[in-house]
């Protein structure tokens, strides 16, 4: 909306520009002519050091977007707010799309998770709950969950919102809840969010040693 791109043209433009970025990273002279972009023998003066290019991770929340991630990127970046059962089904979609594109499993399969460690689950819920719940209430008002399955609305009581979605508890609790992501799905790059809007920094710092030393 901010760039006045009609909804019906956004995906096509995204795909077009992603391919252009990759060409600019790897080709000496790039020419392109479309409705929204004209390039005539353009060359990037400063190119990425990584060869052939930096890996591209595409986040995706629904089947078509996950298929696009398999087709156009080096890895599907798994979101932090889908429930475990949904991710299990989406992994099937992703793997099928990889096979259809004659691509092997990615070297890195990243996931982001909302995680907070404390001495036990009740304490973690009590401490992190107000900040994490507030964040997802805002997401719900923005309509961010409209791309999610109907039963995964963010407009739920916190106890229901957490189930199968966020990792809150003791280090042992967190470890047990994270295990399926690497044992079953092969995810090998974990990005953690443990500090949310309004949370004093010292509270997040209390969680971090438990994650780094005991998780």
Regions found by a protein language model. Name each.
Residues 1-214:
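Active-site-adjacent structural elements that line small-molecule/cofactor binding pockets in enzymes
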């Amino acid at each position: 909306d901010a760039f006045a791109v009609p909804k019906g043209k956004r995906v096509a433009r995204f795909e077009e520009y992603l391919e252009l970025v990759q060409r600019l990273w790897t080709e000496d002279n790039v020419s392109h002519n479309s409705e929204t972009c004209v390039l005539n023998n353009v060359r990037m003066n400063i190119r990425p050091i990584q060869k052939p290019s930096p890996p591209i991770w595409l986040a995706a929340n629904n089947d078509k977007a996950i298929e696009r991630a398999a087709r156009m990127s080096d890895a599907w970046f798994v979101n932090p707010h889908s429930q475990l059962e949904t991710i299990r089904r989406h992994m099937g979609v992703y793997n099928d799309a990889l096979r259809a594109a004659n691509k092997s499993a990615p070297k890195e399969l990243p996931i982001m998770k909302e995680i907070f460690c404390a001495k036990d689950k009740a304490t973690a819920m009590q401490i992190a709950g107000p900040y994490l719940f507030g964040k997802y209430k805002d997401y719900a008002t923005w309509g961010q969950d409209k791309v999610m399955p109907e039963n995964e609305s963010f407009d739920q009581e916190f106890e229901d919102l957490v189930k199968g979605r966020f990792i809150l508890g003791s280090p042992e609790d967190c470890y047990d809840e994270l295990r399926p992501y690497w044992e079953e799905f092969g995810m090998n790059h974990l990005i953690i969010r443990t500090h949310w809007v309004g949370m004093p920094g010292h509270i997040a710092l209390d969680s971090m040693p438990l994650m780094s030393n005991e998780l």
